[in-house]
Amino acid sequence: MIKGGGAALLQEKIVASVSRAEIIVVNRTKLVDQLGVFPLPVEVVPFGWQVVFNQLESLHGNPDLRLNKGKPLVTDQGNYIIDCHFRKIKNPKLLEHQLNMIPGVVENGLFINLCTKMIVADGEQLTVRDRK
């Protein structure tokens, strides 16, 4: 699962990691067959963000610095978000490890094994999915 479109991925991941249950509610348009359809946010410290950007390019992440009114978007923790367009993420665990090994990366939007239940809204219908 990829989260962090609202730029609070560090906070969300901290809460998810200490929760007994992580229940996510989504619209069916967020469901994909392959991770990478939507950009993967990577939270980075402002100092040296360009170096991290270059490292993300070397991982074929096709990165974009997320902007707000022409300036880097700043998270509640004072960091920047770089959105990576990997197209297909075949091995999320490996990618998460590679991202976390880059000096300057604070967190990434891969929420691996943190969601225990997902509620999917499709018009008037709700579907509950438990983690497999």
Could you say what each language-model-derived stretch is?
Residues 1-132:
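Conserved phosphate- and dinucleotide-binding cores of soluble alpha/beta proteins
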